């Protein structure tokens, strides 16, 4: 049994220093229409936020999807899944820091465990990267606690920074980096899907798809349909588009 998954960073945030509030921002129907062209079984959205999103939500509802959200209490911001109505969904758990949501999706009798994560960032200094590592450890501890890890798929924005072969003593990334992500997942028999290219600003590969041993990634790619811009509410990362099969 296979399913199609799309991960998107919706690029929503509140500019509180400018006196803005959630309703000052728009998540438009145009964004929904671009996502819906991909006809995924499930859309895993990070950087979602309660805002002016009525037409966006209506577009998915009309197309036959149900929204499942895990939002923080401060900004009403976090993870949102859109899942085809054909598939029963069970919400398992969520975190506010990092943003994380775990659901189980039942496709024709096959249960898929989906975890979507966004590691939160602040100033890119040592303390920030230490916090990112603590957030990732929290996710790992949660994975370790699961009794049922069958058909486990993890996706999202892991915010480990630029990938280097080594990290100097004066680089904050020494506290949390791509290699740590790969190694800690491998220790749990979870591997990153190889995806060509970069996912953010043309030089960072921080959005990933990871699967357990009994899932096979049939194909996975970064897809950029929104271009370069600075518009809040329009995705600024490449989407991950993938087909995954239970074996």
What role is predicted for each listed range?
Residues 16-20, 91, 118-136, 162, ...:
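Surface-exposed cleft-lining segments at the edges of enzyme active sites
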Residues 1-61, 247:
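N-terminal, active-site-proximal structural segment of metallo-dependent hydrolase catalytic domains
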Residues 135-160:
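His/acidic metal-ligating clusters that form di-metal
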């Amino acid at each position: 049994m296979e399913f199609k998954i799309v991960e998107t960073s919706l690029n929503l945030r509140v500019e509180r220093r400018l006196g803005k509030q959630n309703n000052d921002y728009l998540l438009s129907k145009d964004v929904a229409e671009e996502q819906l062209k991909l006809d995924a079984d499930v859309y895993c959205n990070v950087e979602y936020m309660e805002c002016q999103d009525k037409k966006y939500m209506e577009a998915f509802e009309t197309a036959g999807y149900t929204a499942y959200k895990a939002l923080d209490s401060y900004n009403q911001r976090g993870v949102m899944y859109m899942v085809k109505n054909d598939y029963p969904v069970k919400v398992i758990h969520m975190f506010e820091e990092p943003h994380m949501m775990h659901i189980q999706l039942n496709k024709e009798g096959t249960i898929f465990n989906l975890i979507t994560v966004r590691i939160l960032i602040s100033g890119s200094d040592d303390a920030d990267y230490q916090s990112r590592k603590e957030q990732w450890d929290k996710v790992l501890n949660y994975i370790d606690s699961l009794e049922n890890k069958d058909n486990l798929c993890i996706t999202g924005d892991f915010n480990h920074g630029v990938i280097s072969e080594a990290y100097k003593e004066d680089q904050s990334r020494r506290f949390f980096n791509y290699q740590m992500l790969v190694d800690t997942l491998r220790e749990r028999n979870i591997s990153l899907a190889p995806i060509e290219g970069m996912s953010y600003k043309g030089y960072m590969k921080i959005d990933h798809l990871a699967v357990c041993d009994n899932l096979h990634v049939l194909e996975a790619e970064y897809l950029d349909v929104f271009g370069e811009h600075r518009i809040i509410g329009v995705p600024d990362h490449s989407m991950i588009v993938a087909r995954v099969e239970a074996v």
